Amino acid sequence: MLKTSYICNCDVIHEDIVNDVKSKMQSKDDYIQLASLFKLFGDGTRVQILHALEQSEMCVCDLAVLLGVTKSAISHQLKALRLANLVKFRKEAQIVYYSLADDHVKEIIDKGFEHLWQK
């Protein structure tokens, strides 16, 4: 049985392009961190939470009712989003309110929907 190799054995054809693009590439660690960020958007509940928080700051109980899941499930997802600096929180008496960490998060969600709905 032949083993197929997918490694390109050709020489550089457009060295100027390769060098130009190479100078604009980020570090491998940056790509790993970006991939980790995008993984957070791979869960529908987390994306729904982010979209809801784009509309208004909300507490765990209200998010749970809105999305039809348990408070525990919402808290679990919010922890992941908080650790990635996608959401922030503030306390008011016994209630914790969550909101998007900054406008960049809103832009990511908005661009995602824009891409989804393009014709």
PLM region descriptions:
Residues 82-92, 99:
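Beta-hairpin "wing" of winged helix-turn-helix
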Residues 26-70, 96-103:
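N-terminal helix-turn-helix DNA-binding core of bacterial DNA-binding proteins
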Residues 99-119:
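Conserved segment of winged-helix/HTH DNA-binding domains
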Residues 51, 76-77:
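Base-recognition residues in the alpha-helical recognition helix of bacterial helix-turn-helix
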Residues 1-41:
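N-terminal leader segment of winged-helix/HTH proteins
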Residues 65, 76, 82-83:
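Alpha-helical residues within the helix-turn-helix
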Residues 73:
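Residues in the helix-turn-helix
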